[in-house]
Amino acid sequence: MSEQETRGANEAIDFNDELRNRREKLAALRQQGVAFPNDFRRDHTSDQLHEEFDAKDNQELESLNIEVSVAGRMMTRRIMGKASFVTLQDVGGRIQLYVARDSLPEGVYNDQFKKWDLGDIIGARGTLFKTQTGELSIHCTELRLLTKALRPLPDKFHGLQDQEVRYRQRYLDLIANDKSRQTFVVRSKILAAIRQFMVARGFMEVETPMMQVIPGGASARPFITHHNALDLDMYLRIAPELYLKRLVVGGFERVFEINRNFRNEGISVRHNPEFTMMELYMAYADYHDLIELTESLFRTLAQEVLGTTKVTYGEHVFDFGKPFEKLTMREAIKKYRPETDMADLDNFDAAKALAESIGITVEKSWGLGRIVTEIFDEVAEAHLIQPTFITEYPAEVSPLARRNDVNPEITDRFEFFIGGREIGNGFSELNDAEDQAERFQEQVNAKAAGDDEAMFYDEDYVTALEYGLPPTAGLGIGIDRMIMLFTNSHTIRDVILFPAMRPQK
């Protein structure tokens, strides 16, 4: 057996011994009838204590004689004979406990406290003071074991480093890694700030079906499920768009939804099959209004959540306080591939040849508009680092967007890019029922030709349009990618609490 194998075997034995030891301690607690008490109440969290009392010196704290109670997980413990220091971690952060034998009821220190393990959840009551190094601490007069941890924590010095374990056992990641906890705190704050931003502008939050008979609103491969009672195949939604626009037809002129979408596609650092989107629809507006709203939203979120309009992502700094760049799709192609003959983008055969020359495999079902879009994706998208709006998307790849009045081959649509990736997609909505019916039929034809991401024909949505959809603009923003930017996270798995993972064998 190699040295590495021997070390691994010894670690497994040590781990099993620790599990056995902890279970024996729990068994003893059960016999005493105090295994999982539920009568301890705290009056402060660690962050509340630091915020209120960090500025006070020890003399002032002693004169105030402030008694507090806290509860949380024991992360570290230094036993020094008759006294110990404990690091307690709770939802707000960490606070130090000073545990002295003579300050506790008889027997608690030696017979109970010293037998507890790291990871145990405890309650503590005592008075505030500061150590000689100036650290705010609690001099404990009462200690309670609230939950016995049967498994040891990850490496207490280096945190949890194994990426697979971090994602599969997110609870361990949250215990061990401050950055992970902060990422999801920021996520929650951003979602709350988005809702506040939208409601302040007269939008109503709504909920639309997650299971749909006809999946629509995006070009993507759906998940299929079966409704037993109805004996009906249904689809997990790929987007809420068509239902939200039905609500605008019904008279709700400003609506938004923050919820999950599901797409049966690949997994990557940018893609998870289950992801969060915000979609909004605003009557009597066009895509220019949404460009202004998007800029304002990102500026507001940065200021309110991070306290600055400058956001650092990797080696880049984005200043949301400045106007965002705006380019048409063709301008972006020319900017990032200057040798492009723009006339080639007006001819199918020339565009096809150009696409193939830069490594794009052109599918039989693609028209000129799809080819031009793929060329843009290949030559320009990765260069769109600073906040940029790309406009004038071809009608072929925009089956729900309003055609441009001057050039009907393009639409009044934009996509919003930051850090070389798409963050949002918005457009003036197509509200011509006959045009929509024709485009749905084109999608049906594309699906028949082999495009499994083409849309289904939604007859009821066409019927809704026949009752009249007012001039409307719609916007979708990928919340997960937004959170990646605001938390400087470089894989989508870092911002989704429980990302999709292949089952362990």
Swiss-Prot record:
Covalent S-S links between cysteines: none
Transmembrane intervals: none
InterPro entries cross-referenced by the UniProt entry: Aa-tRNA-synt_II, aa-tRNA-synth_II, aa-tRNA-synth_II/BPL/LPL, Lys-tRNA-ligase_II, Lys-tRNA-ligase_II_bac/euk, Lys-tRNA-ligase_II_N, Lys-tRNA-synth_II_C, NA-bd_OB-fold
Cofactor: binding comment: Binds 3 Mg(2+) ions per subunit. The third one is coordinated by ATP.
Pfam family, one: tRNA_anti-codon
Amino acids binding Mg(2+) 1: E415, E422
Domain of life the protein comes from: Bacteria
Modified residues (N6-acetyllysine): K114, K156
Subunit-structure text: Homodimer.
Note: There are two lysyl-tRNA ligases in E.coli: lysS is expressed constitutively, while lysU is heat inducible.
Entry function: Can also synthesize a number of adenyl dinucleotides (in particular AppppA). These dinucleotides have been proposed to act as modulators of the heat-shock response and stress response.
Record's protein name: Lysine--tRNA ligase, heat inducible
Organism: Escherichia coli (strain K12)
Lineage: Bacteria, Pseudomonadati, Pseudomonadota, Gammaproteobacteria, Enterobacterales
Gene field: lysU
